[in-house]
């Protein structure tokens, strides 16, 4: 165990947990990194002193926690509040007559489709020589003969 060292004048005391570590952030996590262990023999010494894997993982955690906290704060700042205006009942729109509107739409579509189908229809083509046959019949029967065969409509006595 390390002996507690006295605080220097330039240091500020940070809140610590029961194991002597500063809190990572205000949210509780179900996991924590292990405290740094003394470096094994043959460990590299850097300008900042010996580095252990658990110390690096703690520093990485602290950095990631800072990044996550900054990003969540930034997201909260960008969040917009949405309030729906209250409409007085006198200005509220009347409920539409959905069934009648659907029936009207259906009948309109149906009539337009029927008109399109009728417009696309054409008379069937006459068989070869059919036109000549019709002209011959009209000539033989004569235009006046057809009129002679017509009957007069009955007269109404109302």
From Swiss-Prot:
Region (Disordered): 1-53, 78-97
Residues making up the signal peptide according to the UniProt record: none
Residues with the Phosphoserine modification: 33, 37, 54, 57
GO MF assignments: GTPase regulator activity
Source species of the chain: Rattus norvegicus (Rat)
Biased composition (Low complexity): 43-53
Name used for this protein in its record: G-protein-signaling modulator 3
GO cellular component, as recorded: cytoplasm; plasma membrane
Pfam families referenced in this protein's UniProt entry, alphabetically: GoLoco
Phosphothreonine PTM sites in chain numbering: 60
Localization, UniProt: Cytoplasm
């Amino acid at each position: 165990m390390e002996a507690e060292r006295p605080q220097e004048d330039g240091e500020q005391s940070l809140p610590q947990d029961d194991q002597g570590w500063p809190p990572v952030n205000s949210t509780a996590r179900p996991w924590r990194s292990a405290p740094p262990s003394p470096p094994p023999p043959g460990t590299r010494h850097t300008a900042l002193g010996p580095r252990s894997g658990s110390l690096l993982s703690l520093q990485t955690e602290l950095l990631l926690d800072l990044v996550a906290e900054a990003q969540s704060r930034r997201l909260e700042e960008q969040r917009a509040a949405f309030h729906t205006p209250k409409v007085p009942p006198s200005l509220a729109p009347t409920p539409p007559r959905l069934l009648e509107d659907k029936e009207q739409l259906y009948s309109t579509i149906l009539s337009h489709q029927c008109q399109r189908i009728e417009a696309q229809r054409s008379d069937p083509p006459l068989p070869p020589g059919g036109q000549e046959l019709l002209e011959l019949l009209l000539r033989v029967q004569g235009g006046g003969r057809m009129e002679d065969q017509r009957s007069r409509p009955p007269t109404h006595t109302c």
